[in-house]
Amino acid sequence: MNEDNLIWIDLEMTGLNPERDRILEIATLITDNELSILSEGPVLTIYQPESQLLLMDEWNTYTHSSNGLLKEVRSSKLNECDASILVLKFLKNWVPCKSSPMCGSSVAQDRRFLLKYMSELESYFSYRYLDVSTIKELMFRWRPDLKTGLQLHKSHRALADIQESVLELKYYRKYFINCN
């Protein structure tokens, strides 16, 4: 356990509104300060009833059908509470409570869903964020020439997306922030 380790998280959801939409998948991983992946947490698919899945818009329905997530959601036996307990068990082996910012891409959106459906997990993070999307926005505005050097696949599966977020931050660190 190390208080300098970083917790990375990604959620896949039925939509963007936590008042109506639900979590479909959650994944976490741990890096050190140099962004080396130390461990990958459980990748958990959360059951949602068909009535909830029918509320998804066209983009979410197509994307989560194409990548196989909806099939896994329909056969999952886990609910949000089960998933939260399993993720916390993993995190407690690597990072003390309240010591890591929430790391990932557009993690403020993920935090809204965690607060609504997995509040104990949400409270494990510090109040801070390490949001790769913010750095991306700055790079696009200040160094648009760097856009072409990074190829992302965005499978819209939780583990693959956070692995890409770590790679993305490594790229920005090397070419945009220049601290190597």
Curated annotation (Swiss-Prot):
GO terms for biological process: DNA metabolic process. It is found in: Cytoplasm. The active site is at Y127. Coiled coil: none annotated. Its main location: cytoplasm. GO terms for molecular function: 3'-5'-RNA exonuclease activity; nucleic acid binding. GO terms for cellular component: cytoplasm. SMART domains: EXOIII (SM00479). CDD domains: Orn (cd06135). Residues 6-169 form the Exonuclease domain. It holds the Pfam family RNase_T. 3'-to-5' exoribonuclease specific for small oligoribonucleotides. Belongs to the oligoribonuclease family. HAMAP family: Oligoribonuclease (MF_00045). This is Oligoribonuclease. It comes from Blochmanniella floridana.
